[in-house]
């Protein structure tokens, strides 16, 4: 039976910082300057995950496409190989915001790669600073969206409304994956889920983020009711990031040719 496998990973800009207190405090300087060797080690670990899982589509948030802090090392291009010839990478900040012009932030990106050429769009939400949403057509009636929402709850609420409008304008079934930054709890998603009718695939007891002793469920996969029974999600720890990766299997689904 055909299936589609999607990997969604927040690699934390390849700084090699786990959620441990020691990493986040003693190695915090990596946010300003990070040796290429460290980033290459992270990229190699990501490649091992990709090789093991063999996803059809990989989505990355918090990926660095090369800047002074990283000695112009392009993490996505180091991850890619001949199995994933189709890709895109873009700054997550809308060009109309001042953040897009700040050199330190200019290389902060979202990206994806795929085994097949899939129609896609870069959609920018109307609210917030981080606005980029990738809209990828997996098949004529199935669309994948992935993004990275604001850390501010009030801005997230506006972004959820913005994304809802995009979903409403897109026919067929939907899959939404991303870093939702809902550190205050999943109840803030209730209006969005009610209006879109999306269902969360995550096990609520399995956190995806850690800092020291704190744990939180912030990285989510959602899908339309019509495909929920065919969706299975696994959480994969990443020692090089404070976020776990999501592996979503959609059974009885075929990618567009």
Language-model segments: residues:
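Short, flexible loop segments at the rims of nucleotide/cofactor-binding pockets, characterized by
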Residues: 33-39, 123-124, 150-155
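Active-site environment of divalent metal-dependent phosphoester hydrolases
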Residues: 14-15, 65-68, 95-97, 152-155, ...
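Active-site beta-strand/loop signature of hydrolases that rely on acidic residues for catalysis
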Residues: 6-10, 42-71, 144-147, 162-190, ...
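N-terminal, active-site-proximal structural segment of metallo-dependent hydrolase catalytic domains
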Residues: 1-82, 253-257
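Beta-strand-turn-beta hairpins that frame and shape the catalytic cleft
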Residues: 1-7, 15-18, 114-119, 130-146, ...
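Metal-dependent phosphoester-hydrolase catalytic domains
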Residues: 118-124, 137-139, 165-175, 180-257
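Short aromatic-enriched loop/helix-cap "lid" or pocket-rim segments at secondary-structure transitions
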Residues: 16-22, 71-73, 99-102, 157-159, ...
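Structured beta-strand-rich core segments of catalytic domains in phosphoester-bond hydrolases
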Residues: 38, 62-141, 234-238
């Amino acid at each position: 039976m055909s299936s589609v496998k999607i990997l969604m990973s927040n690699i934390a800009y390849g700084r090699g910082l786990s959620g441990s207190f020691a990493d986040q405090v003693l190695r915090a300087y990596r946010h300003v300057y990070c040796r290429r060797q460290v980033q290459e080690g992270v990229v190699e670990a990501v490649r091992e995950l990709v090789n093991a899982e063999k996803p059809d589509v990989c989505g990355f948030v918090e990926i660095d496409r090369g800047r002074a802090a990283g000695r112009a090392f392009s993490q996505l291009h180091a991850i890619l190989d001949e199995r994933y010839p189709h890709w895109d990478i873009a700054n997550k900040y809308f060009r109309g915001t001042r953040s897009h012009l700040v050199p330190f932030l200019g290389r902060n990106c979202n990206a994806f790669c795929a085994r097949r050429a899939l129609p896609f769009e870069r959609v920018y939400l109307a609210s917030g600073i981080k606005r980029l949403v990738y809209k990828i057509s997996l098949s004529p009636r199935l669309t994948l969206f992935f993004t990275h929402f604001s850390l501010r709850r009030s801005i997230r609420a506006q972004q959820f409304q913005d994304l809802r409008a995009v979903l409403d304008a897109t026919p067929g079934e939907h899959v939404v994956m991303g870093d939702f930054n809902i550190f205050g709890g999943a109840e803030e998603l209730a209006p969005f889920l009610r209006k879109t009718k999306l269902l969360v695939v995550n096990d609520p007891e399995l956190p995806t983020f850690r800092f020291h002793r704190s744990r939180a469920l912030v990285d989510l996969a959602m899908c339309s009711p019509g495909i929920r029974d065919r969706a299975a999600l696994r959480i994969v720890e990443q020692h090089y990031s404070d976020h776990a990766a999501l592996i979503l299997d959609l059974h009885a689904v075929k990618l567009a040719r």
